[in-house]
Amino acid sequence: MRASRPVVHPVEAPPPAALAVAAAAVAVEAGVGAGGGAAAHGGENAQPRGVRMKDPPGAPGTPGGLGLRLVQAFFAAAALAVMASTDDFPSVSAFCYLVAAAILQCLWSLSLAVVDIYALLVKRSLRNPQAVCIFTIGDGITGTLTLGAACASAGITVLIGNDLNICANNHCASFETATAMAFISWFALAPSCVLNFWSMASR
């Protein structure tokens, strides 16, 4: 007796892992095809993704920036201490101006040093436009005051020492040292001001 045989033979189902791989391959092919079509229709209108650049050395929130702030504060405090150690500086307006500018410079630099330390501890980048603008304006103001006070004190020191020749009755060495410290503080401030201005202008 002849028995009929089935026309369709059963096929074992593929394992789930093979199904997942096949589905992923189909999805990738579909995505590539869609992307190619979009690129063909979009042409040159597609914008490249932005690349975030690293902060330059000396920028706010970097070890270099913290070092500059500490140097600024140190020499401003040194200028203040040396000038305040003399008992006759209040009689000269330029020296009083230097003391006031040194106090402002020291407070400003120490405040930004604290901000840099916080940014380094939490590993944040100080790229906020408002913060960079405040840093730039503050550096510009304190830098102008410090440079003006140092130049005025240098002029008075030269007048006392070279023109009037009365250093025997004054603390010319202390005046010269305080003036030099103020200039060094300003030179340390200049890179911070330039970097902040460049960062603000490049946005």
From Swiss-Prot:
Bilayer-crossing regions: 64-84, 95-115, 140-160, 178-198
Residue ranges that the UniProt entry lists as topological domain Cytoplasmic: 1-63, 116-139, 199-203
One GO CC term, this protein: membrane
Residues covered by region (Disordered): 39-58
Subcellular location(s) of the protein: Cell membrane
Cystine crosslinks: none
Extracellular face of the membrane: 85-94, 161-177
Membrane-protein topology: Multi-pass membrane protein
Chief location: membrane
Pfam families: CASP_dom
Keywords attached to this entry: Cell membrane, Membrane, Transmembrane, Transmembrane helix
Subunit structure: Homodimer and heterodimers.
Similarity section: Belongs to the Casparian strip membrane proteins (CASP) family.
Protein name: CASP-like protein 5A2
